[in-house]
Amino acid sequence: MNKKKILLLSDDLRMSSGVGTVSKEFVLGTINHYDWAQIGGAIKHPDEGKAVDMKDALKEDFGIDDGYLKIYPSSGYGNPDMLRSILRLERPDAIMIYTDPRFWMWLYQMEREIRSQIPIFYYNIWDDLPYPMWNQPFYESCDLLMNISKQTVNIVKNVRQNKPVEDWQCTYVPHGINSD
């Protein structure tokens, strides 16, 4: 059986940022169940324009024989043309974004184009009040909102008023690093 493929849009998982570190945990923790591609963002990314096949690194560094991970480095977080090209090449089953949604303005401007083909998932780290009403259009443009805390679930449900979510669309996925 072929594994589903997820296109992750976040900080490059090889980088040491908090978002990069948690992105790495997502991928390594689920690579036996999913194939992964990533638009890996960084400031002035040294590998921009390359496609980095991580198959050998997965095997050598983590003992993973059947994992698929390809990183498309980007200075910043990509753009519509880059995304369209990667969607054609990788043919993912879903997109998952992770970081402040305001970094993805270009993505949300093309959400209908994307969601007509595949769903958009958002791992949401917003847990501070007051309610970020400016995030309403971002939350409403996602098919699944995975939230780091019960407070974040509360925020999403109070902000996403025009298009209320079903329970399965707004889940609690605890934030943290695998201690194993």
Language-model regions: role of each:
Residues 143-180:
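Donor nucleotide-sugar binding/catalytic pocket of nucleotide-sugar-dependent glycosyltransferases
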Residues 39, 72-74, 173:
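Hydrophobic residues at beta-strand termini and immediately following loops
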